[in-house]
């Protein structure tokens, strides 16, 4: 399984790069990468050029890719990560992919394990509302690779939702107030 962390958003409402906010004593991007690595994943991080030096400082010896057109949309950011994977992983074309938005760190280790074991496109849900991370199957990855960069992901895949008890599943770090709500 492959993994990509989407960290190329403009963070306009937050007023600072989401990937670099302090989260449990370290940059949020470092927190997420270390959690994913503890489950055997080697995430590719896709970010903006303006913060790449800071991201690389937080993540030495990790794979970090610059999205040269981050305003084109989330699918375009995901495509940047996919290109990196296809260029460096021996040309393997079919793989499952875990997609982790940097601003959605509220999933539990149990939820992550369920995603890693899943054999269908899926995402966790709490109280009937879908959350993140998102697990894509090879056919979903193929559709994303050939889509326009501004195509909404919801038009390219239809994840099955599985209910979880993660108290912070819907934590979405978009504003300074959201940082105060994080109790992960």
Outline where the language-model segments fall.
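Conserved alpha/beta core of the MobA/IspD/sugar-nucleotide pyrophosphorylase nucleotidyltransferase superfamily
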Residues: 1-3, 142-184
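Nucleotide and nucleotide-moiety/phosphate-recognizing core
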Residues: 1-130, 138, 160-166
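Conserved nucleotide-sugar donor-binding
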Residues: 131-142, 176
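Short aromatic/basic micro-patch
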Residues: 106, 135, 172-173
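Glycine- and other small-residue-rich loops at beta-strand/loop junctions that grip anionic moieties
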Residues: 100, 133, 171
């Amino acid at each position: 399984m492959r993994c990509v962390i989407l960290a190329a958003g403009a963070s306009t409402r937050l007023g600072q790069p989401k990937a670099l906010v302090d989260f449990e004593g370290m940059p949020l991007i470092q927190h997420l990468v270390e959690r994913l690595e503890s489950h055997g994943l080697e995430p590719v991080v896709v970010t903006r050029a303006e913060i790449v030096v800071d991201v690389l400082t937080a993540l030495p010896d990790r794979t970090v890719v610059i999205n040269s057109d981050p305003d084109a949309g989330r699918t375009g950011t995901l495509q940047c990560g996919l290109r990196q994977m296809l260029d460096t992983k021996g040309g393997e074309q079919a793989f499952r992919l875990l997609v982790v938005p940097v601003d959605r760190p509220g999933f539990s280790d149990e939820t992550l394990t369920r995603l890693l074991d899943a054999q269908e496109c899926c995402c966790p849900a709490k109280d009937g509302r879908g959350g993140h991370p998102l697990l894509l199957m090879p056919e979903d990855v193929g559709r994303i690779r050939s889509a326009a960069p501004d195509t909404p992901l919801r038009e390219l895949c239809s994840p099955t939702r599985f209910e979880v008890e993660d108290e912070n599943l819907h934590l979405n770090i978009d504003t300074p107030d959201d940082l105060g709500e994080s109790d992960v």
